[in-house]
Structure formats: structure tokens, C-alpha cells
UniProtKB/Swiss-Prot annotation:
Protein's UniProt name: Arginine biosynthesis bifunctional protein ArgJ, mitochondrial
EC number: 2.3.1.35, 2.3.1.1
PANTHER family the UniProt entry points to: ARGININE BIOSYNTHESIS BIFUNCTIONAL PROTEIN ARGJ, ARGININE BIOSYNTHESIS BIFUNCTIONAL PROTEIN ARGJ, MITOCHONDRIAL
Free-text function comment from the UniProt entry: Catalyzes two activities which are involved in the cyclic version of arginine biosynthesis: the synthesis of acetylglutamate from glutamate and acetyl-CoA, and of ornithine by transacetylation between acetylornithine and glutamate.
Quaternary state and interactors: Heterodimer of an alpha and a beta chain.
Species the sequence originates in: Penicillium rubens (strain ATCC 28089 / DSM 1075 / NRRL 1951 / Wisconsin 54-1255)
GO MF annotation: an example: L-glutamate N-acetyltransferase activity
UniProt site (Cleavage): A224, T225
Catalyses which reaction(s): N(2)-acetyl-L-ornithine + L-glutamate = N-acetyl-L-glutamate + L-ornithine; L-glutamate + acetyl-CoA = N-acetyl-L-glutamate + CoA + H(+)
Keyword set, alphabetical order: Acyltransferase, Amino-acid biosynthesis, Arginine biosynthesis, Autocatalytic cleavage, Mitochondrion, Multifunctional enzyme, Transferase
Family: Belongs to the ArgJ family.
Location in or out of the cell: Mitochondrion matrix
Amino acid sequence: MATSLARMLKGQVRCYSAPLDMAIPASKQRYIPTTGTYPQGFQVSGTHVGVKASNTRFPDLALIASDTPCSAAAVFTTNKFQAAPVQVSRKTLQSRKGDGIRAVVINSGCANAVTGKGGLEDAVQMGRKVDECSGVENDSSLVMSTGVIGQRLPISKILDRIPTAHSTLASTHEAWLNTARAICTTDTFPKLLSRTFTLPSSPDRSYRLAGMTKGAGMIHPNMATLLGVLCTDAAVEPAALQSILKHAVSRSFNSISIDGDTSTNDTIAVLANGAAGGETVRAPGASASADYTALQGVVTDFAQELSQLVVRDGEGATKFVTVRVRNSPDYESGRMIASTIARSPLVKTALYGKDANWGRILCAVGYTQGVAEGTVVPERTSVSFRPVDGSEVLKLLVNGEPETVDEQRASVILQNEDLEIEVDLGGGEQGAAGCGGEDAVYWFCDFSHECIPAFAVDIIESREISGLKAFGSENAYIYEEEPLK
């Protein structure tokens, strides 16, 4: 049965699924950086281990190391079945109070989740082997894993290859890109960004920020991984770094949706080694410092750009959609509404069908749970499509009254890969339009004909189907819909 279903679905999976030779689909080439500016004092490597027996030559062990101790912060999945590396890394950060971290080691091909005490011991061994190779004290490294749930790591193979990973550390663009490849599962392209920035206290000093992430689609509900690592050579105290990361993630990795499921392994971490010099960014007291505010903005913008690459790689997706909720009486209520729209199968399928069905959008607004009383008032609510080319918005509903829609223009707008939906709540019951603080923004993709085959292929005997899994992996990613903490 599985074999026949596999054969039936083989020709239906998304046409841009990466083949086993690691070739990047032509439609995704534009997202691959050809160069980068990387933070001082960090070195990285991507090494082949063969965590999965089917992977005979592609990198599946990533190592990110700093020459000097780092401040570190992380947010983790809220899933009750938290993977061993999540538990170990959280304990490491807590015991060190976010200080003195030297490396992050990541394997793909096995999630090391729901693996009992043995899995916890494996995660500890991975971190300590990196510490040993680096010549630093134990528990100086964070550990992440991604892949199949419920299977033990081939820990001996991994431990044997960590010295190679350490000896091949480098700071070149090629090394960073290869490291980003090593954390991929069903991703069709490695997700890597870098940039430079300045801070008010040192306007003539350049700082650098780099980050990588992985994620693309679903294999089993609540059973896969979104991972991300950010590195900067700015000096930031741990408390400030944790606060900045939490703010950034709430507006980036916690504001994207592909299939609305919560993973066992989701982890986003940031390391700051201070190698660029300058003043240390500290947590705000009564008011935020100029450096803190500036860095928070830089990291948030960067995390948004990085997380959006995940949506652009969504399994079965043909569109990249921004939903913006404006003039909500409070940010969190607006964010809940944006999240509900982003997760609605009816909205997703309407967009795939290029149907300007604003009723489905309005329906999602109306049934959103947990919003403050008086947030949604029908006669104050408006819905529009905002074209990405900057042309005039297409109004669909204004203050609860339907507009006469130019169907031809709507069709043209919906032909584009990128689209923005704008929902204006008009300030809610109080009618305080423009006084609701920042816009709540979510990014999501549509559901196409290819979604079900793409998801189903991952469930059946996928190793019977050659050439369907990106980078030689049978694993998949699921986005964390509940907030990382």
C-alpha cells in the first residue's frame, strides 16, 4: 500500500524539491548569498557524518564557534515533549546565566527527541566533545538537533567526527554557507544572511551580524524542527541579549506560519562575543539606552528577513503573503488576529486559487480567540489588498461595508507571488484609529494542490522514493506556532 501510494505521489510533489545532488532550484537561487560580511572571532564548519544511513556525502553536522567567550541567549519550543538538546541547552544557559558560551553544535538527520535518559546523555556528550576539542571547560556549548523523532543518535559516529568539524573551522563565506547547508532537512536551499551595522555610542565602528536558519514544511504534526543561530561581534550583556532576542523572535520567527504546528526541537539562539570592541550594550533600566534600542531594531529586522526565508521555502507553496493588522487597540490582540488569518486553510486555498474572497479573511478576523473585548467592531473594520509594486491599494471592505471590487485588477494582484493583506480595525470599540501602537504583521504561504502530496510523501516509506528529499534527508520541518520562550 505504501509503495503504491508512494508511486502515485512521486510525480505530484512540489517541482522545486531539491534533488539528492544538493542542486538549488532555479526559482530559489536568488535567495542564496554569493558573499557575506561575517562577525569577527567566529568560525564555522559543515561536516559529513552520515547521521542517516542514506546520506553518504552531504554535510549534516554544523559547528559554530567563537574564539572568545560569548554572551548567549535563546528561546525554545513550548511543546511539552521537549527534545533532549532543548533541555540540555536550556540547562547550560541557566547554569551559566548566559555567559561564557563558546560554541553551538547542530546535527541534522535525527531530532534526538523522545529518547529518554539516553538521549539526554547523547546531547551532553555532543556538547562536551566540542568543549574538549576547543580546550574549554565543560558545558560551554549549546546543542541542537533536527530530524526524525523517537530515534537515538548514532552518537559514536557524531563524536568521532566532531574533531574533524573543529579542525576545519573557517571564517570564509563558503564555510558559512556550507554550515547553513549542514542543518537543512527538506529545505530546498540553505538560509543564510549577514549584515553590518553601527551603534550610537560608536558611530564610526562597524559591527557585524550573521545568521542561519532551517525549515520548509511538515512531516508529522508537532514532530520536527525550526532552528536558528545568530552571531554578532558586538558586546552585549546576557540580560540585554535575552530581552532583545525575545522581542525580535515575537516579531519574526513567532510571526510566520506554514502549517501551524508546534515542534519538539525549535530553538533560536544568539551569541555575542564583543570582538569588534566598543561599549557593552546593557539591559535597560528605567529607560532603554540608545545602543539597546538601536540593536533591538537591527536584530528584529534581521530576524524578520531570516524567518521570511522559511516561508518562501514552504512545502507546496506558491505565494508569500504578508498580513498586516492595523489600528488594533493593543498589539497582542492584533497579532492574534494576524495569526488566525495566516493559519486559515480557507484563506490559504483562496489565495492559491487567486480568488479575492475577502469573506474568508473577515471570517478569520471574527472568530479569533483571546482578543481583548471591543477589539473587533464590524462597522469599523476594513480589508484591502496592497500590491507589492506600490500601486494604489485595492479596497475590499471599508468600515464594514463591501466595496465594488475591480475583479480584473484583483486578478492581476493575485497573480503575483508576493501579496499583502491589510486589515484595519479602526481602533476597535473606542474608535481610536492610529492609536493602537505598532502594526501586527504575520508572514505565511498558501496551500496548493501540491501540499497534501508533499506532506503525505513524508509520512509513507519515503526512502522508497529516490530524489524527493532535499540534501539527501527524509526529515521535515514544522513551524512553531505557539511562541518560543
